[in-house]
Structures are given as structure tokens and as C-alpha cells.
Amino acid sequence: MNIFDRKINFDALLKFSHITPSTQQHLKKVYASFALCMFVAAAGAYVHMVTHFIQAGLLSALGSLILMIWLMATPHSHETEQKRLGLLAGFAFLTGVGLGPALEFCIAVNPSILPTAFMGTAMIFTCFTLSALYARRRSYLFLGGILMSALSLLLLSSLGNVFFGSIWLFQANLYVGLVVMCGFVLFDTQLIIEKAEHGDQDYIWHCIDLFLDFITVFRKLMMILAMNEKDKKKEKK
């Protein structure tokens, strides 16, 4: 039999029999909201780079934090759904604005870094998401404690590096942080499934978890590529 004559059963590939239909519908809403966030964040980054709207990174970070707290404090219901979607869009927009300075830095180093970092992040996110979806339920939830501990250590080392100013420690934080955030994609995806299976239908808040995972992976990968490119330019001189 010629292997090239075989037909691929895409329905079988996309069949998640271990996930209930209601949870699958919930995941569709989560990823639809995630796509909306990506579009709005891209618009926010573009607006910053063209108009330098809200130039101070602190203001955009503070604004996104306020919107996140507001969203968290607003209960999920049919009556508040439109309001919470608006808050989600505002949060995504300001997050995109906050990415502006990092994007400008990478463009100054090498404009090709941006599409490379985005495509790399998309591939990483897709692969780890599919791994979490196809894996046995709760198989990655044990990572929660490990990931939170690693995140705490990264935060402490980042604060310590403010005083030490070590480039080696900064680079180590980038690489280790990238690995940790890949783990969070696995953990958060399976946690969302478990929450949905137990009746938590707040797809807007679940979307924020995945959106922040994607943005953090993108930011770290972008900075790693930019630093590597700068090192290459130094070696050529």
C-alpha cells in the first residue's frame, strides 16, 4: 500500500473524547476571546509606535493592572458579559501599548526579530497547548507548585539584579523564564479544562491566563533574539 495514498482523518485528530462537549464549547469561547486580545494588543502596539501614545511604560502597566482588578471584581454573568469583554479589550490594548518600547528596541537592532519572535511564540504556544489538550486530564497540574516556586525565584533574582547589574543573571532569567512560561501554558490550559469541568464558565478570565502566557513568552523570546543579534554585531566589529 502506498503511504502517500492514505487519507488523513482530521476529525480524528481534532477529537478530544476525554473533554466533555460543554467544556469544548467553553474552550472555543476562551480561544475566540484570546484571538480578540491578540488583535487588540497588536493595535495597541501599533498605536504606540506610530503616535507614542502613553509613552511611559509605567502608565500603561498601571492602567492594565487597574483594568485587570476591575475585571476580577466584576462577577461573570450574562448581564455583565459585554462590560467584561470591554474591560478585556482595554486590558489587551494597554498590554500592547506596554510592549511598544520593547518592539522599538528590537526594530532598532534588527526588524526581522519581530516576525521571527512572533512565529516562534505562536509555534511554542500551539505545540504546548495541543500537548495539554491531548494529554490525560490533570497530568500537568502537578507542575503548579514547581512553576510558582520557579517564578518566585525568578522575581527575587530580578530584584537582586537591580543592585548587582549582572548581564549574565539577566540572560539566565530570560532563558529560565522562557522555560517556566512554556510550563505555564501546559498548566494553565489543563487548569482551565478542570475549572470548566467543575462548572467555572468564566471564559473571559480564563482567556487572560492564556493571553498573559503568550505575551510573556513573546517578550522573553524577543529579548533573547535581540540580545543574540547584538552579540553577533559586536563580534563582527
UniProtKB/Swiss-Prot annotation:
GO BP, one annotated term: negative regulation of calcium ion transport into cytosol
Compartments, as annotated in UniProt: Endoplasmic reticulum membrane
Transmembrane segments: 30-50, 53-73, 87-107, 113-133, 140-160, 167-187
Stretches within the membrane that do not traverse it: 207-227
Cellular component, GO, one term: cytoplasm
Membrane topology according to the record: Multi-pass membrane protein
Family matches, as InterPro entries: Bax_inhbtr1_CS (IPR006213), Bax_inhibitor_1-related (IPR006214)
Regions of this protein lying in the Cytoplasmic compartment: 1-29, 74-86, 134-139, 188-206, 228-237
Main location: endoplasmic reticulum
Tissue and organ distribution: Highly abundant in testis.
Residues in compartment: Lumenal: 51-52, 108-112, 161-166
Assembly notes: Interacts with BCL2 and BCL2L1. Interacts with ERN1.
Family from the record: Belongs to the BI1 family.
Name of the molecule in the record: Bax inhibitor 1
